[in-house]
């Protein structure tokens, strides 16, 4: 079973935690991770891009000049794609880019990135994470004490308004509940800072 050190908010080693091998010790499947990240990014797309085809642009119903005799190239409409102000060829229209990925695939991807974080020593486990009051300064101090990377994802066990409002203002730092963890965020941030209670929730959810 993989083991990690447990730190307190001052960065001191206070114990060791045995991680569930079924979640933090799987064979990393890079292709599954790629597919899930691609799915997440596709689902985020607004899909509101829109442009007009030549049939939708106002005007252009009259032939601009006669077919022959002018010396100029023949034209049928001033709204043809080659004209300034003309329509767009195969103009994009609003569409839904989202699609579903099987639950088993999503779970395998999460397990793969969590395993990778443990293997690369990028997962920092805290015994607890508490702040007496909303303070970005103290939040920065905690991250500095535990030597987290400048790009860090903080994972807590439950919604805590004090922690959310303290960490959300730090550049390149995100905070989320364990049950809302996702593959893209795990890869986007170099350090994964997680509490022991949040680890238990992950082991319950993804077991």
Swiss-Prot record:
GO terms for molecular function: rRNA binding; structural constituent of ribosome. The keyword RNA-binding applies. Keywords: Ribonucleoprotein, Ribosomal protein, RNA-binding, rRNA-binding. GO terms for biological process: translation. Residues 44-81 are annotated as: Disordered. Part of the 50S ribosomal subunit. One of the primary rRNA binding proteins, this protein initially binds near the 5'-end of the 23S rRNA. It is important during the early stages of 50S assembly. It makes multiple contacts with different domains of the 23S rRNA in the assembled 50S subunit and ribosome. Forms part of the polypeptide exit tunnel. Belongs to the universal ribosomal protein uL4 family. This is Large ribosomal subunit protein uL4. It comes from Finegoldia magna (strain ATCC 29328 / DSM 20472 / WAL 2508) (Peptostreptococcus magnus). The gene is rplD.
């Amino acid at each position: 079973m993989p083991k990690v050190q447990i730190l307190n908010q001052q960065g001191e080693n206070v114990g060791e935690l045995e991680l569930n091998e079924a979640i933090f010790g799987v064979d990393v499947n890079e292709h599954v991770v790629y597919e899930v990240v691609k799915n997440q990014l596709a689902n985020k797309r607004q899909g509101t891009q829109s442009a007009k085809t030549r049939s939708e642009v106002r005007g252009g119903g009259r032939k601009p000049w006669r077919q022959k005799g002018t010396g100029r190239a023949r034209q049928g409409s001033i709204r043809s794609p080659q004209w300034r102000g003309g329509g767009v060829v195969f103009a994009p229209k609003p569409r839904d880019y989202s699609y579903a990925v099987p639950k088993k695939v999503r779970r395998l991807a999460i397990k793969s990135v969590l395993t990778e974080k443990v293997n690369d020593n990028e997962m920092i486990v805290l015994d607890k994470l508490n702040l007496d009051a909303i303070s970005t300064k103290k939040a920065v101090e905690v991250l500095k004490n535990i030597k987290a990377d400048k790009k860090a994802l903080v994972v807590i066990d439950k919604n805590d308004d004090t922690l959310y409002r303290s960490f959300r203002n730090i550049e390149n730092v995100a905070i989320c509940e364990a049950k809302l963890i996702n593959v893209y965020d795990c890869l986007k941030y170099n350090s994964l800072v997680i509490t022991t209670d949040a680890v238990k929730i992950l082991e319950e959810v993804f077991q």
